[in-house]
C-alpha cells in the first residue's frame, strides 16, 4: 500500500494521521507542501492532511480513518 500524506508545519490533524498509520502498522510518506503547491497538485484538496493511497485521493483525516476501518486496518474499539 502506497500512502502519501501531504502536510504543513504545525498541523495537529496531520500528526493524528501519522498516528493512525502507526496504529495500523502501515508505512507512509509525508510530503510538506505550501498552500500554493497543494492547490497546483490537488485543486480539490480543502484541508490538511490530504491523503493519497495507491494513487487514489482519499481526503483528510476523517475520510482516511473511514478508509482504514473499511479495509480492516484498524478497529473502532477504543482500548
Task: List where the protein language model places each region.
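Thioredoxin-like thiol-disulfide oxidoreductase module
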Residues: 29-46
Amino acid at each position: 500500500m502506497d500512502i502519501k500524506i501531504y502536510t504543513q508545519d504545525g498541523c495537529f490533524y496531520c500528526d493524528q494521521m501519522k498516528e493512525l498509520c502507526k496504529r495500523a502498522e502501515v508505512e507512509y510518506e509525508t510530503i510538506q507542501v505550501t498552500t500554493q503547491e497543494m492547490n497546483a497538485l490537488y485543486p480539490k484538496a480543502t484541508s490538511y492532511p490530504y491523503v493519497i493511497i495507491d494513487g487514489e485521493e482519499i481526503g483528510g483525516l476523517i475520510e482516511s480513518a473511514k478508509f482504514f476501518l473499511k479495509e480492516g486496518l484498524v478497529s473502532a474499539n477504543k482500548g
